[in-house]
Amino acid sequence: MNKQVYMDYSATTYTKPEVLEEMLPFFTENFGNPSSLYSFSDKTKKAVNLARERVSKALNAEKNEIFFTSGGSEADNWAIKGIAYANKKKGNHIITTKIEHHAILHTAQFLEKEGFKVTYLPVDEEGFVSVEDIKNAITDETILVSVMFANNEIGTIEPIKEIGELCKEKNIYFHTDAVQAIGHVDIDVKDMNIDLLSMSAHKFYGPKGVGALYIKNGVKIQNLIHGGGQERGKRASTENTAGIVGLGKAIELAMENMPEENEKLSNLRGRLIRGIEARIPEVKLNGPKDMSRRLPNNVNFSFIGIEGETLLLDLDMNGIFGSTGSACASASLDPSHVLLSIGLPHETAHGSLRLSLGAKNTEEDIDYVLEVLPKIIKQRREMSPLWEDYMKNKEEK
């Protein structure tokens, strides 16, 4: 059996043993409904409150501003639809970017069919949105700006504080999808003037199927899910106690480990980028060149003359697991909307590989990838008419 190297931590992470350990009693012993009044539910009630406290501490938010959801997609949907419907008397215009996660883009497209107007702002070749562009897009009808904290494909960390200041000045709600940022970037919702923020536990070593939405006190938002009075009447459904406990523990660990973890990941990322650039000709690093403005675990390359899907299968056969884009879209054969938005031609975007690093990756893993990947690229290019055409054109120039 080949060595196995998982490098798709931006798609999902494993649940850390300490997190699982804290969750387990809530499946078997402490199974009471947290909304019940009797004492049997006291432990579950306390556990949910502790998780809320841990999340609020991580964001510098108030405890009553944290609402648990089934994940990042629900949190994004709630933020966008909830603000749109609750504030439509004030205006019907939303501003976002072309490189958002599909949970934002598809929600925005849904709202367009409902009569809302949406501006999808372009980004530069490194994936940054311009604060000036946001300013120029604002109209009297604008009720919400939604910009992701960090991009899941190319690792770009957006100028969130500046956008928050602009939105505060213009009296417009500001939402950020921070699903990729938790555990990698310092987040302070007060200092950054963030009104709404989405997160998902499985991106920071917590369980799948649980997330949270931070909603600043005073924000006018409509419910997405109707039913019982859970989450202070804002989000119906019996609380997923074990999941919520896991999210709380995972975010606490993520905050504690962040400085050390980021340094480790940055070093591994540097080794991987330098190694690929030194060993493989005609490659393009996608995303920010200034590594301080990029997620410490993100590497995204385009290889001229290569099909991304074929590359993934070749790597898989060698025990290396990466991605050609976000996992939510990798079943589709269309090139990544993010890579097209940063100006890559169709065929270059098609030949992209994202390697996202995480807690279990080592220098040995990096060296193994650097041993295997160049051989695969060389072999595939020898069979590729795209590569042949590219080299011919290059020689003619």
From Swiss-Prot:
SUPFAM superfamilies with a match to the protein in the record: PLP-dependent transferases
Which residues are involved in binding pyridoxal 5'-phosphate? G72, S73, N152, Q180, S200, A201, H202, T238
Where do the annotations place [2Fe-2S] cluster binding? Answer: C328
Query: Which sites are catalytic?
Result: C328 (cysteine persulfide intermediate)
Question: One Pfam family this chain carries?
Answer: Aminotran_5
Query: Which reaction is the catalytic activity of this chain?
Result: (sulfur carrier)-H + L-cysteine = (sulfur carrier)-SH + L-alanine
Q: Give the EC number.
A: 2.8.1.7
Task: Choose one Gene Ontology CC annotation of this protein and give it.
Answer: L-cysteine desulfurase complex
The UniProt similarity line reads:
Belongs to the class-V pyridoxal-phosphate-dependent aminotransferase family. NifS/IscS subfamily.
Q: Which PANTHER family match?
A: CYSTEINE DESULFURASE, CYSTEINE DESULFURYLASE FAMILY MEMBER
According to the record's subunit comment, the protein's assembly and interactions are: Homodimer. Forms a heterotetramer with IscU, interacts with other sulfur acceptors.
Q: What does this protein do?
A: Master enzyme that delivers sulfur to a number of partners involved in Fe-S cluster assembly, tRNA modification or cofactor biosynthesis. Catalyzes the removal of elemental sulfur atoms from cysteine to produce alanine. Functions as a sulfur delivery protein for Fe-S cluster synthesis onto IscU, an Fe-S scaffold assembly protein, as well as other S acceptor proteins.
This protein's name = Cysteine desulfurase IscS
